[in-house]
């Protein structure tokens, strides 16, 4: 459709919204990473905001949470270069598109994994509510697009596998959304150890309280939507970002037939993946 064409473009074969300009995407490979940069990597709707909220609290000295590296136009690069404080940089890029400087300098990175069925549902609602994304007529149509990788940021499977190839890199920590839901203090502790920051049990407790979904959602509703606060490359309206944050919502959307189709594709694509075996439905 016309709207589809106007709102999206492809770069390296991956669909991006026009909020990621081709000029910016082309320039990324020359991006100057710093050794103390921390990356928050995810496929959309995997819990990036939650992760960002926690990391900002683990670091008590001044750090800057930037908007995603691929969000905006070419002026973005200079903006990031001008930041004097430590940078926490979110991104939805797959591993091959990540600026090589981050790899050379072995910057620390978190990769958050969420059950892709829940991601598909969350993304479907997001497409419906977000004017920067094409209109999708129905859940059934959206699911087909999702499985084909014809959605923003491309195929979940490819994205996941591109990062999983680096699961033994010491500078990358893989986290599961569902583990965070189940035992957040344990995950926060793991994150702080990875970052080399000492925090007490009472500080962990406080971080978890401030990072509850309800707390984060109500904070966003109180704030004005400041585009500089977004860690989403698809919108600057933060109210669109928090919906349910639950585990297993896919069961309210998938028909048995759709579930079977999804499972077949998942099993085929993820046959050799170790991390995929740990995904909780």
Q: What is the predicted role of each segment?
A:
Residues 48-61, 175-199, 207, 215, ...:
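PAPS/PAP-binding and catalytic site of the sulfotransferase fold
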Residues 95, 116, 179, 211-214:
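Residue-level detector of flexible, active-site-proximal loop/helix-junction positions
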Residues 147, 196-240:
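Catalytic lobes of large eukaryotic enzymes
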Residues 155-158, 186, 202:
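Generic recognition of short, well-ordered alpha-helical interface segments
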